[in-house]
């Protein structure tokens, strides 16, 4: 089966596992997913991730919860979709919950947060919001 939107699949798997309070979630691997997960780990939304390099590579994401088993990820939303791409210039880069959340932006310098994109003065495709 061909996956038409791997980013939406990644976000949905994380959202569902997070709501069910699963400690880990597995998904098929891709370079784009690894870049997104790297940014999510830097921002503190996930604990860790690892790649299982079998015949069909899989990513195992370890989700992050507080000491009282409270979810760190409150929400995930896909913005730019295959049917409707959403691009933003430097001036129009979105702020998620007045800076409490993060917009994932695909730029010529890789996947960056909205803050990093503003610092580097580059716009790009707004992939998703994480808060």
Curated annotation (Swiss-Prot):
Keyword Ligase: no
Residue ranges of coiled coil: none
GO BP annotation list: translation
Keyword Membrane: no
One Gene Ontology cellular component annotation held by this UniProt entry: ribonucleoprotein complex
GO MF: rRNA binding; structural constituent of ribosome
Swiss-Prot/TrEMBL keywords: Ribonucleoprotein, Ribosomal protein, RNA-binding, rRNA-binding
Pfam families: Ribosomal_S8
Alphabetical list of NCBIfam families matching this protein: PRK00136.1
Assembly notes: Part of the 30S ribosomal subunit. Contacts proteins S5 and S12.
Function: One of the primary rRNA binding proteins, it binds directly to 16S rRNA central domain where it helps coordinate assembly of the platform of the 30S subunit.
Family assignment from sequence similarity: Belongs to the universal ribosomal protein uS8 family.
Protein name in UniProt: Small ribosomal subunit protein uS8
Native species: Acholeplasma laidlawii (strain PG-8A)
Source species taxonomy: Bacteria, Bacillati, Mycoplasmatota, Mollicutes, Acholeplasmatales
Gene label: rpsH
């Amino acid at each position: 089966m061909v996956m038409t939107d791997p980013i939406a699949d990644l976000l949905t798997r994380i959202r569902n596992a997070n709501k069910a309070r699963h400690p880990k979630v597995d998904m098929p691997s891709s370079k784009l997913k690894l870049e997104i997960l790297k940014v999510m780990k830097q921002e503190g939304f996930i604990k860790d991730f690892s790649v299982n390099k079998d015949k069909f590579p899989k990513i195992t994401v370890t989700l992050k919860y507080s000491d009282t088993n409270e979810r760190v990820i409150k929400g995930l939303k896909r913005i730019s979709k295959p049917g409707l791409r959403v691009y933003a210039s430097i001036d129009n880069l979105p702020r998620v919950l007045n800076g409490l959340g993060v917009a994932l932006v695909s730029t010529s310098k890789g996947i960056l947060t909205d803050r990093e994109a503003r610092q580097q003065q580059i716009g790009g495709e707004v992939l998703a919001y994480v808060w």
